[in-house]
């Protein structure tokens, strides 16, 4: 497997496309090897789950509010009718401090809708340093394709 030795082909495709859809073997291991090779090549990486992502641009780049679960407790009179809102720092803010390219690796990407996947592709086009890899499910062998090819654009 020459791909796992250097990761050069994967890096070249990632830089050319910006947003890749990936199918990985279910036993795992290949994604961590690729992440390790990306880090060694000077990329900054963030591994995250696609579940609960919401609006990708706001979640990744802007300060935003979340509502924690109430766990059965009632907060009568302390907060508004919508409940407590906590401010959360954006996930990718600290990774953009220098000119190194940033790779966002999303697990369980098959739960994302077509519009959310298109929004991730648009983010890669607008922010030149951002690269996105979305795991779209399992396969017998490691393979990837540009997200635009998967979506049919």
UniProtKB/Swiss-Prot annotation:
Question: What are the protein's UniProt keywords?
Answer: Membrane, NAD, NADP, Plastoquinone, Quinone, Thylakoid, Translocase, Transport
Chief localisation class: membrane
Q: Name its cellular compartments.
A: Cellular thylakoid membrane
The organism's place on the tree of life at top rank:
Bacteria
EC assignment: the record states 7.1.1.-
InterPro entries per the UniProt record, alphabetical:
NAD(P)H-quinone_OxRdtase_su_N
Reaction(s) catalyzed by this protein? a plastoquinone + NADH + (n+1) H(+)(in) = a plastoquinol + NAD(+) + n H(+)(out); a plastoquinone + NADPH + (n+1) H(+)(in) = a plastoquinol + NADP(+) + n H(+)(out)
| GO CC annotation terms, alphabetical | plasma membrane-derived thylakoid membrane
Which top EC class is named for this enzyme in its record?
translocase
Topology in the lipid bilayer = Peripheral membrane protein
Q: Which GO terms describe its molecular function?
A: oxidoreductase activity, acting on NAD(P)H, quinone or similar compound as acceptor; quinone binding
Determine if Thylakoid is one of this entry's keywords: yes
Job description of the protein: NDH-1 shuttles electrons from an unknown electron donor, via FMN and iron-sulfur (Fe-S) centers, to quinones in the respiratory and/or the photosynthetic chain. The immediate electron acceptor for the enzyme in this species is believed to be plastoquinone. Couples the redox reaction to proton translocation, and thus conserves the redox energy in a proton gradient. Cyanobacterial NDH-1 also plays a role in inorganic carbon-concentration.
Assembly information from the UniProt record: NDH-1 can be composed of about 15 different subunits; different subcomplexes with different compositions have been identified which probably have different functions.
Its family remark reads: Belongs to the complex I NdhN subunit family.
Q: What is this protein called?
A: NAD(P)H-quinone oxidoreductase subunit N
